[in-house]
Amino acid sequence: MFTKTDIEKYFMAEKSESLLFVIIGVAAILVAAVFFFFLKTHFYKGMALPLLLIACIQLTVGYSVYKRSDDDRKRNTYAYDLNPSDLKNKEIPRMEKVNSNFVIYRWIEIVLLLAGLVLIFLYRDNTERSFLFGIGIGLAIQAAIMLGADYFAEARAKVYTKGLKDFTAKT
């Protein structure tokens, strides 16, 4: 049975994961800065590039989700008791869009992971191409992190969406 507690848990988990995204993004930026400004080899400069670029995405997405999670939680727990039609007419369509976006994100992340792995295997023994080897490692690391995080977020979103649908079908 879907309850207000399920809504609370979903948004608290969403907020926690988004904070983790922010922390990972900040850490990746710091690591990229060390690689670029202190280690300075082609390999580390190459690795810094995808770390930095994907960290910007992690910070942006993480912060925006973190910022809105409490309002979403309050709005939907309120709607659960006083206006269940809002869950049906607003929250379910929003979550269906979120779930369809996860499919897109997953394929992008898989492509980035594969691109990183291709660069790693093509240039692992080629010292003249250590920049590309570094890009491959940084890209593979960041894509794997994003893929893993989105896997859990997608699983949570599917359970939450199903709960919403079951609840609104009964009201």
List each model region and its residues.
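Alpha-helical transmembrane segments of integral membrane proteins
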Residues: 20, 46-50, 104, 108, ...
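Amphipathic alpha-helical interaction surfaces
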Residues: 62, 66, 101-104, 120
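C-terminal halves and exits of single transmembrane alpha-helices
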Residues: 85-116
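Long, highly hydrophobic alpha-helical transmembrane signal-anchor segments
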Residues: 10-59, 111, 115-126
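C-terminal membrane-adjacent module
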Residues: 121-171
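Canonical hydrophobic alpha-helical transmembrane segment
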Residues: 51-63, 137-147
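Cytosolic-side membrane-entry/anchor segment at the start of a transmembrane helix
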Residues: 1-34, 90-102, 149-171
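Membrane-helix interface/capping segments
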Residues: 65-89
